[in-house]
Amino acid sequence: MYKAQVTCAGADGRWLYDDWKLAIENITSDDVTCDIKFETIPKTYLNDYIISLLESEQGTGKVVNENGYRYEGKNPNNYIWFNNEYWRIIGVFDSVSHGVSGKNLVKIIRAETLDGLAWNKSDTNNWKTSSLKSLLNGAYYNAQDGTSSGYCYGYSTTETANCDYTKRGIQSGYRGMIASVTWHLGGYSSTTSATSSAFYGYERGTTVYSGNATSTTGYIGLMYPSDYGYSVLSSSCARKTDLWSYSSGTCAGQSWLYGKGYEWTLTPSSSDSYHVFSLDDEGYVNGNGSSASIGYGSRPVLYLDASVYKIDGDGSLNNPYIVRM
């Protein structure tokens, strides 16, 4: 395995590992020279590497062990270059989270939302049969145009969204890095507030609205409420704080997941057939849930195969992790 070190005079240079070629930018001279050195480095699996960072400072955050090895804080060094764009690492999780026996898998989330998409065009909160699950695991996963797929809606079935994923979807060179996993669909009644730890248990429980699935399998999902809850800096926002009360600078303001507006989570209400827990633009989890047919920001979440390894980067925005399989 090789790591490229690029030094240029008269411009900035970087090695494109996907294309295995040099990219030159920010040219300031007519005479540009670049020196490229290739270094043989040992294979470091990404999951093991992140676990080794436990309790170490990472940007304005750190890695903690709370129902998984997770990044917390306002802007930790958890950037990863995946699918030719920025994603961010939620953490490393065992089979309790993803169902792949004996494996620690890295869970990542797209840095930006795709679009405002209905969680389910039929306004029911069963993820296993939802339009968004079909869209993300179909057209998005296969980098196809899903606009006319029957699943691409910004609101109910009355507003078609932009679901052309030929370029924004998962490209062929990256699909093999994604693990097919179990997504837990346990719900919560929302009659009382809940902390991150409580939500983590509800998500993996079996309390659901009558007829809804308690789990399903697939490549692409969404974040859980607990993923958001654990993303805040615990020294600023105590873990005993319920997620309904996160709309403050000390809680939402110290979370790297906050700041993308209204967003869907994967977790449904168990009180009725149509509410799903969502992240409000003020930074709290909506305790009443939102109607599944509404168009909210949707950020794909996936687990990387355990064989994915790190070849470069420190996780910062300007030097994201570069991975291979």
What are these model-predicted stretches?
Residues 1-325:
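Long, domain-scale functional regions
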